[in-house]
From Swiss-Prot:
GO biological process, one term: photosynthetic electron transport in photosystem II
Subcellular location: Plastid, Chloroplast thylakoid membrane
Phosphothreonine: residues carrying this PTM: 3
The protein's assembly and partners: PSII is composed of 1 copy each of membrane proteins PsbA, PsbB, PsbC, PsbD, PsbE, PsbF, PsbH, PsbI, PsbJ, PsbK, PsbL, PsbM, PsbT, PsbX, PsbY, PsbZ, Psb30/Ycf12, at least 3 peripheral proteins of the oxygen-evolving complex and a large number of cofactors. It forms dimeric complexes.
Family that this chain belongs to: Belongs to the PsbB/PsbC family. PsbC subfamily.
Free-text cofactor note: Binds multiple chlorophylls and provides some of the ligands for the Ca-4Mn-5O cluster of the oxygen-evolving complex. It may also provide a ligand for a Cl- that is required for oxygen evolution. PSII binds additional chlorophylls, carotenoids and specific lipids.
Coiled coil, from the record: none
Record keywords: Acetylation, Chlorophyll, Chloroplast, Chromophore, Manganese, Membrane, Metal-binding, Phosphoprotein, Photosynthesis, Photosystem II, Plastid, Thylakoid, Transmembrane, Transmembrane helix
Organism: Stigeoclonium helveticum (Green alga)
Signal peptide: none
Name of the protein in its database record: Photosystem II CP43 reaction center protein
A single GO cellular-component term on record: chloroplast thylakoid membrane
GO molecular function: chlorophyll binding; electron transporter, transferring electrons within the cyclic electron transport pathway of photosynthesis activity; metal ion binding
Alphabetized InterPro entries for the sequence: PS_antenna-like, PS_II_antenna-like_sf, PSII_PsbC, PSII_PsbC_sf
Length: 461
């Protein structure tokens, strides 16, 4: 039998009597034990990074280069491919070794974090204030809290700049808009014009406006990261070297549970934004890796049948459909030439395989008759049969599959999971904000635990 580092392994102030929280309340028992709470957070980070590394290696082991990523149920390799690792023209995977390296690095990192989590949870000091005052804190210390906020902002800003450096100096990133069907390229001229970058924030979120989700070129994405990274770094320095203003002290609740609620609210917003980005955007989330968007699959089907019937002799410019509108082509509300049929609802779709066929007034008839390239036909046919949809009825005219066809788009997985998680985080935000505000007002201690069913169970030890 091995000797434990800490022979006592006593609860040490983590029991119900001393904290007001029982074991099933988890980290709430550690609210006033900064060292133990550090251990919980480091261990949690270790679990997250372990999942990333293990799942990364799992996807590498199962990856078949001859098939598109979105046909293989992958969600991590598409992210690495979007960063320009291992991919060449057209999104073709030419080297899987960078993916293997990524998985191994994450696994090694998770081991370090896991050790740190166990150490600080069991062996290290329970509180940091006495031995390491720089890392110690009290929740009501407003200056310390904003300093911690500042350090977090600087780290986030550095993370944003990592993408900028990767795109500009270290191999570039994958650009689905590169001529000929996408390629990995260096971003040499990122957009730094604040009117363009912050213009996205001022746009309507509805329809073709699409708020920040409407970003459609890599220059704006990298330029946006330059702005956000710089603002976060300078904002972090500001928060470290200043104290909160009087109105800030009055406006906010300054307690551990309040900070939890703020964090949950922020991550809920990020979950909802990620949901919309993953579902609609085909620049930050290239369709070569994630599969087509819903509008993209619908438009590609209309394009595929236009190509087929044009070859069979149809006059695609004048043919009428069953409603009397154009069967293949029609006019948009603003007078542009667009695809006809049910896909008319997606008339403002933009995609790299379709844009070369547009002119000043929408789709160019001359280009449709003479300039369609084989790669555009192949890509549209592939996207048409991989819509991010189940077998629904109202799907923009996309031919749905029989139930035995087992395809679920990564866009469906990512959008659904981020929406659901964002919603749960938002509910948690409301819950903890309500508790924190009530506690600050002095009239709410929490739910009466006298009737808690768990209290009737035998103690774990």
């Amino acid at each position: 039998m091995e000797t434990l580092y800490n022979g006592t392994l006593s609860l040490g102030g983590k029991d119900q009597e001393s904290t007001g929280f029982a074991w099933w309340s988890g980290n709430a028992r550690l609210i006033n034990l900064s060292g133990r709470l550090l251990g919980a957070h480091v261990a949690h980070a270790g679990l997250i990074v372990f999942w990333a590394g293990a799942m990364n290696l799992f996807e590498v082991a199962h990856f078949v280069p001859e098939k598109p990523m979105y046909e293989q149920g992958l969600i991590l390799l598409p992210h690495l491919a979007s960063l320009g690792y291992g991919v060449g023209p057209g999104g073709e995977v030419i080297d899987t070794f960078p993916y293997f390296v990524s998985g191994v690095l994450h696994l090694i990192s998770s081991a370090v974090l896991g050790f740190g989590g166990v150490y600080h949870s069991l062996i290290g000091p329970e509180t940091l204030e006495e031995t390491f005052p720089f890392f110690g804190y009290t929740w009501k210390d407003k200056n310390k809290m904003t300093s911690i906020l500042g350090f977090h902002l600087i780290i986030l800003g550095f993370g944003a700049w990592l993408l900028v450096w990767k795109a500009m100096y270290f191999g570039g990133v994958y650009d689905t808009w590169a001529p000929g069907g996408g390629d990995t390229r260096i971003i040499t001229n990122p957009t730094t014009n604040p009117a363009v970058i912050f213009g996205y924030l001022l746009k309507s979120p509805f329809g073709g406006d699409g708020w920040i989700v409407s970003v459609d070129n890599m220059e704006d994405i990298i330029g946006g990261h330059i702005w956000i990274g710089t603002l976060e770094i300078f904002g972090g320095i500001w928060h470290i070297f200043t104290q909160p203003w009087a109105w800030t002290r009055r406006a906010f609740v300054w307690s551990g549970e309040a900070y939890l609620s703020y964090s949950l609210g922020a991550i809920a917003l990020m979950g909802f934004v990620a949901c919309c980005m993953g579902w609609f955007n085909n620049t930050a989330y290239p369709s070569e890796f994630y599969g087509p968007t819903g509008p993209e699959a619908s438009q590609s089907q209309a394009f595929t049948f236009l190509v087929r019937d044009q070859r069979l002799g149809a006059n695609v410019a004048s043919a009428q459909g069953p409603t009397g509108l154009g069967k293949y082509l029609m006019r948009s509300p603003t007078g542009e030439i667009i695809f006809g049929g049910e896909t008319m609802r997606f008339w403002d779709f933009r995609g790299p395989w379709l844009e070369p066929l547009r002119g000043p007034n929408g789709l160019d008839l001359n280009k449709l008759k003479n300039d369609i390239q084989p790669w555009q036909e192949r890509r549209a046919a592939e996207y048409m049969t991989h819509a991010p949809l189940g077998s629904l009825n109202s799907v923009g005219g996309v031919a749905t599959e029989i139930n035995s066809v087992n395809f679920v788009s990564p866009r469906s997985w990512l959008a659904t999971s981020h929406f659901c998680l964002g919603f749960f985080f938002f509910v948690g935000h409301l819950w903890h904000a309500g508790r924190a505000r009530a506690a600050a007002a002095g009239f709410e201690k929490g739910i009466d635990r006298l009737t808690e069913p768990v209290l009737s169970l035998k103690p774990l030890d």
